[in-house]
Regions:
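Boundary/linker segments flanking structured domains
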Residues: 1-306
């Protein structure tokens, strides 16, 4: 099959910031990143182990229990919240659900450590099962994930189902900020293409005059659709079996005659991995789709194939 153009173009969206929290901790997450996509996850049930606290002058250690459907293990974490403080002078309280460790000073001040961020920030690793993917980008970019999730009916249903079906796990939210990049592929080996040299130049000029370098609704639409089609989360209905599709709300990339889309996640930034019942994601192995059927359009990444 001949390549359509000598110069082919694709969209690459990659995660530039990611956060993971419990639903009732959303208000504590930094709102500085512009989160565009959220995932509702099942994660191992984490709890502080009561009675495990060992307090020394210069440090503290505490145990965390990590429970899944198939395993139950613990991890001891040693930490110091300030090298000059005598840690014996503080009061330490683990709450009833064993999700928070409160550190109180003599004057009543202090801090609260939630088990999930505490575990991840101190070398813990979590596999996160994706059960739903959604976007938090409104028509004019006005809606954020925090507003969207406050009264999210699907989140409420997942939490309700989870109480009865998966008591060995917790529900968490992964928030993703994405950054776009233009991919370009030139084939200088072959001499014959479906389109002429002038058509190739016209196509290149059209794309370079409208590069996908700004976040907009269509960019988030196509990123969300690609993620849903790849992972096929349990609670998603749309895009599971009909992506890509020229009739969906990302027609911009068809109008510019893009060849492909790549979506890249980096959950390792927060010591996590992501998977669904359908697929496990591997870091540095991006999700790749051609926007046209293989029998009609050669992939821009297929340089050496016939």
């Amino acid at each position: 099959m001949k390549r359509k153009y000598m110069s082919e173009f694709g969209l690459h969206t990659f995660s530039s910031f990611v956060s993971l929290c419990y639903p009732n901790d959303l208000q504590t997450v930094s709102k500085e990143p512009r989160y565009h996509i959220y995932m509702i996850n099942k994660i191992p049930k984490l709890t502080f182990i009561k009675g495990s606290l060992v307090i020394k002058e210069d440090s503290i250690s505490v145990g965390i229990n990590i429970k899944t459907e198939t395993d139950n293990k613990s991890k001891t974490i040693d930490f110091s919240f300030h090298p000059l403080f005598n840690h014996n002078l503080f009061k330490y309280i683990i709450d009833k659900p064993s999700k928070s460790l409160t550190i109180q000073g003599e004057n009543g001040g202090g801090a609260i450590c939630r088990v999930l961020p505490f575990y991840l920030e101190n070398g813990g690793y979590l596999d996160c099962e994706i059960v739903y993917i959604g976007q938090s980008y409104g028509k004019k970019g006005e809606r954020d994930a925090f507003t969207r999730l406050k009264s999210h009916s699907t989140l409420q249903k997942i939490q309700s189902d989870h109480l009865f079906e998966s008591p060995e796990s917790d529900i968490a939210i992964t928030l993703w900020e994405f950054t776009p990049r233009l991919l370009t592929s030139f084939d200088g080996i072959r001499k014959e293409f479906e389109k002429s040299s002038q058509e190739d130049i016209d196509h290149m000029q059209k794309v370079l005059e409208n590069p996908p370098l700004k976040i907009d609704k269509q960019l988030i639409n196509i990123t969300e659709a690609a993620l849903i089609n790849y992972f096929k989360p349990e609670y998603n209905q749309h895009f599971k079996n009909n992506f890509p599709d020229v009739g969906h709300d990302y027609k911009y990339y068809y109008d510019l005659d893009f060849n492909s889309i790549l979506v890249e996640l980096d959950p390792s930034a927060i010591n996590a991995g992501v998977y669904s019942k359908e697929k496990k994601y591997k870091v540095f192995n991006p999700i790749e789709y051609t926007l046209h059927p293989e029998m009609m359009r050669k992939s821009m990444f297929d340089i050496f194939g016939e």
